[in-house]
């Protein structure tokens, strides 16, 4: 079930959260720009805190494999944003000293950049990577995390 609560407080922007991760472990992102300047998410805490529920899993949802961000949007499936995924990483790391998505990749289909590409997060080697996929990309490793608002 959906038993992992993620609370997004005001001020928790993509770059703020990425910086918090960078203070705890190695990180990499696809751009030198501030993530706050390039990320557009379905939900933000700009108007106040909110909460979502995710499945409590290390790897992104098996149920979401081979489904592109565009298909997710067409089917109106609610999935985590980049902010929510990074918050989950921080929470999981503080609880376990381990990382999420060590074998798979979370497609953050609740977020886009200005040109419409979709962020993803994974643990690769010794770093948390924030990368990008085209909205039509789909494969077995790339999976969104379904969310309940």
Sequence positions of predicted segments:
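A binding-site-centric feature that preferentially detects glycan-recognition modules on secreted/surface proteins
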Residues: 1-78, 82-149
